[in-house]
Amino acid sequence: MSIELDLQIACENENGLPSEKELMTWLNAVIPQFQPQAELTIRIVDEKESHELNHEYRGKDKPTNVLSFPFEAPPGLELNLLGDLIICRQVVEEEAIEQNKPLLAHWAHMVVHGSLHLLGYDHIEDDEAEEMESLETELMQGMGFEDPYIAEK
């Protein structure tokens, strides 16, 4: 089992960001359950870049917590590339405060949530959302964090 992470820090203030070791711990709690090898990029950005990408790819005129861009290999070409996660520092920090969650736990949740998207999970339909949230809760609790959806239940 191996995960190759390309970590890109593209925000002005790096204070308080999770370490590469923490990111790898969270990725290793998720990805190896689905595939033994993976390469992915995590890019931590400011609101401006998140806003631009969210507008361009999702038609939403605001920054968002995490964007997932799965890699789709051409037919017949097998690569371990999972894709890219773009995580907005300010949105994650604001949501942690609003939801009264420890900041590190919310970062972990965004990595788990985004990784599941890269692995093909979605939450557009209610049954898909239920399955994905249940898996996120199980993975988060397995790492010693609380249920990330406890406030909504």
UniProtKB/Swiss-Prot annotation:
Chief location of this protein within or outside the cell: cytoplasm
Gene: ybeY
Positions annotated to bind Zn(2+): H113, H117, H123
Keyword Transit peptide: no
Keyword Metal-binding: yes
Cofactor binding notes: Binds 1 zinc ion.
GO CC annotation, single: cytoplasm
Family, similarity comment: Belongs to the endoribonuclease YbeY family.
Pfam families: YbeY (PF02130)
Record-given protein name: Endoribonuclease YbeY
Organism: Aliivibrio fischeri (strain ATCC 700601 / ES114) (Vibrio fischeri)
Gene3D superfamilies: Metalloproteases ('zincins'), catalytic domain (3.40.390.30)
Cofactor(s) listed: Zn(2+)
UniProt entry keywords in alphabetical sequence: Cytoplasm, Endonuclease, Hydrolase, Metal-binding, Nuclease, Ribosome biogenesis, rRNA processing, Zinc
Highest taxon above the source species: Bacteria
